[in-house]
Amino acid sequence: MIWIMTMARRMNGVYAAFMLVAFMMGVAGALQAPTLSLFLSREVGAQPFWIGLFYTVNAIAGIGVSLWLAKRSDSQGDRRKLIIFCCLMAIGNALLFAFNRHYLTLITCGVLLASLANTAMPQLFALAREYADNSAREVVMFSSVMRAQLSLAWVIGPPLAFMLALNYGFTVMFSIAAGIFTLSLVLIAFMLPSVARVELPSENALSMQGGWQDSNVRMLFVASTLMWTCNTMYIIDMPLWISSELGLPDKLAGFLMGTAAGLEIPAMILAGYYVKRYGKRRMMVIAVAAGVLFYTGLIFFNSRMALMTLQLFNAVFIGIVAGIGMLWFQDLMPGRAGAATTLFTNSISTGVILAGVIQGAIAQSWGHFAVYWVIAVISVVALFLTAKVKDV
């Protein structure tokens, strides 16, 4: 427990503010995301095709806007002011969904606001990285603990979202999300620092100009995209699979997701502690190997107890990838924390787009069980690519 004491000694008001903002913004996001399809179906009256189109347009718009803002944030301006602007957009987006039920308005104005709002989280992590670097603090552990706040938010957020939406209505739920974003904005404005741009030494000039030109960055992006494709295919398909083919209760899906999210927290923190000893590549290879075991296990072990037990491998997979994966991008792109963090989050968005298409096609043609064979194969490819990225 020495590392916990060390972290406690190094914690100060600014660090605590980073943690609280990450948690609050995570809860606000976790209130909206799990219930979006239900909202579009019941409140807006959208058919399945239009619901899927909404997700696709939202993801594509998010990638474009976040890359544009990331490039600007790394080269000019105050990153903290950009986060405040994104929070304002998040408030507007939540209020739009609270009081509007027109599909065309939501897929245009709503998607635009959401794509701007979703940039807040990668920019928050980029600001945290720059602050930790400038204050000579432990970057990896701090980032891991901060990322764990998002997992904690996702333990709390989805059950709370369904409780609010089903008992009090979507207007109340989205209004509460807007209120949480407002509190986050106040904390960001008064507690988080503005970090001055650091002039990079000349030997890092190529890294500043490059990024995507680096084959290691490209390979890590593809590997990360495949990892999140696997995770999203599982999240989309699992609730349908356990009820329609395994004959297990619907509520088990919630328990499985909650168990995995809870176990991710210690996995993230332990990964942050051990990464200096073993290196980022080895930790990521261990994580993706755990993912391969998880998805392969789903093919052969389908009982309720087996599914719960397998969540340990799922937690190791997502917990390490979500924390160390982002830091690996940042270390491969020195001086471009915003672009690197956004590239990581865009690998998640790209994975979501691919997962929706692949899962839908496979499940429609060959059934839910075939989905997990495809996921297992994709995870093996991700493991191979991860092992080929250089360690930094």
From Swiss-Prot:
It is found in: Cell inner membrane. The keyword Transit peptide does not apply. PANTHER family: SUGAR EFFLUX TRANSPORTER A-RELATED. It is a multi-pass membrane protein. One of its GO terms (cellular component) is plasma membrane. Keywords: Cell inner membrane, Cell membrane, Membrane, Sugar transport, Transmembrane, Transmembrane helix, Transport. CDD domains: MFS_Set (cd17471). Residues 1-10, 70-81, 128-149, 193-219, 273-282, 330-342, 387-392 are cytoplasmic. Gene3D superfamilies: MFS general substrate transporter like domains (1.20.1250.20). Involved in the efflux of sugars. The physiological role may be the detoxification of non-metabolizable sugar analogs. Can transport IPTG, lactose and glucose. Has broad substrate specificity, with preferences for glucosides or galactosides with alkyl or aryl substituents. Pfam families: MFS_1. It comes from Escherichia coli (strain K12). InterPro entries: MFS, MFS_dom, MFS_trans_sf, Sugar_efflux. This is Sugar efflux transporter A. One of its GO terms (molecular function) is carbohydrate:proton symporter activity. Belongs to the major facilitator superfamily. Set transporter family. Residues 32-48, 103-106, 171, 241-251, 304-308, 364-365 are periplasmic. One of its GO terms (biological process) is carbohydrate transmembrane transport. Its main location: membrane. The chain crosses the membrane at residues 11-31, 49-69, 82-102, 107-127, 150-170, 172-192, 220-240, 252-272, 283-303, 309-329, 343-363, 366-386. It comes from the Bacteria.
